[in-house]
Amino acid sequence: MDQFIKQDETGDLIETGMNVANHFLSAPIQGTNSLSKASIIPGVAPVLIGNPEQKNIQHPTASHQGSKSKGSGSGVRSIIVPPSEASNGGTQIPEPLFAQTGQGGIVTTVYQDPTIQPTGSYRSVELAKIGKERMINRFVEKPRTSTPVTEFKRGAGSRAQGQTIQEEGIDGNGASAGSKERSGSLSGATLYAHLSLPQQDSTPANVGIAPQSAISANEIMDLLRGMDARLQHLEQKVDKVLAQGSMVTQIKNELSTVKTTLATIEGMMATVKIMDPGNPTGVPVDELRRSFSDHVTIVSGPGDVPFSSSEEPTLYLDELARPVSKPRPAKQTKPQPVKDLAGRKVMITKMITDCVANPQMKQAFEQRLAKASTEDALNDIKKDIIRSAI
């Protein structure tokens, strides 16, 4: 039996694997419908997960690796199949699972008819594993030995890379841990990264439903909205306060104008000298003295009739027809109304302050004003003040 895999079979296996990978990557898989250990047919799991006891792939030894480093290897690894399986045609095992796509792009796991036992062999499983491994290693670049970083020069990259490849190799039977090296492409390409191989472990994984979103997220959003509303309210109030700034400035200007006007009025009142009504200011002294002399006063109009007729003697006849003078009724004097002298005293006090400059005369007028209790006395004091000012 041929122990090597033909190139056509390898290409078919790789193409089949790529189609399966694209199929599962293009369809969304939910957590509750994904494959788990419980959905695999008993007997297939040890083969699929690749237990170390059932691996039949023979890796090259140190001698083969040494020959490969010298250029004698062809890059194809050999496969050893147990003689019992080669002679008997393989052990019957269940076929791998089939996947069907249901409604909404959900992938569900189904089996063939349970009454019919599918046929297969470990050889087909081994071939599938080899194809999968080669397909993975196809995109993984082997680690290279570290080389000193040199300044990039055009045309020198290929020679440095060739020199690095010639230095590869392992001495002895130990496994090489590899080494890091700068990427061969110095034109700005992204550095390569090793592909993470799937972990082959027989421990089942617990599948559960993803936790729901946190309940407190709504409270946080409500707090943020409340803070935003309060901030907008404060901004509106600040805008209103700033809008009143012009009005405050206008009120200040008007208040300054009122103060200026009041000061002007107070100054004018301080310069006004309170004088008798009808007595003009700026009259010569001689003319004022002539006005105080005695002279005839003519009163126009009907005059006081009782005053003019009371002086004439009148005879009357009594009950005996004798002429007698009728006795005149006693003239009743009308009580003069009491006048408020407080206002006059205030006026005279102001006149003393403004018109009298001599302190002695001012003190004398103040004493007379304090003793005055009638209107005539106040009038005399006022006349004396006017004479002293002239």
Curated annotation (Swiss-Prot):
Pfam short name (any one): Paramyx_P_V_C
Listed Polar residues bias regions: 54-65
Keyword NAD on entry: no
Modified residues (Phosphothreonine): 10, 16, 91, 150, 164, 249, 257, 281, 297, 374
CDD domains (UniProt xref): MEV_P-protein-C_like (cd21031)
Span list, region Interaction with the nucleoprotein: 342-390
Function statement: Essential cofactor of the RNA polymerase L that plays a central role in the transcription and replication by forming the polymerase complex with RNA polymerase L and recruiting L to the genomic N-RNA template for RNA synthesis. Also plays a central role in the encapsidation of nascent RNA chains by forming the encapsidation complex with the nucleocapsid protein N (N-P complex). Acts as a chaperone for newly synthesized free N protein, so-called N0, allowing encapsidation of nascent RNA chains during replication.
Assembly: Homotetramer. Interacts (via multimerization domain) with polymerase L; this interaction forms the polymerase L-P complex. Interacts (via N-terminus) with N0 (via Ncore); this interaction allows P to chaperon N0 to avoid N polymerization before encapsidation. Interacts (via C-terminus) with N-RNA template; this interaction positions the polymerase on the template for both transcription and replication. Interacts with host RPS6KB1 kinase; this interaction may play a role in the viral replication and transcription.
Record remark on domains: The N-terminus consists of a long intrinsically disordered tail. The central part contains the coiled-coil multimerization domain (MD or OD). Forms a four-stranded coiled coil structure. The C-terminus constitutes the alpha-helical X domain (XD) that binds to the nucleocapsid (N-RNA complex) and the L polymerase.
Protein known as: Phosphoprotein
Annotated source species: Mumps virus (strain SBL-1) (MuV)
Gene: P/V
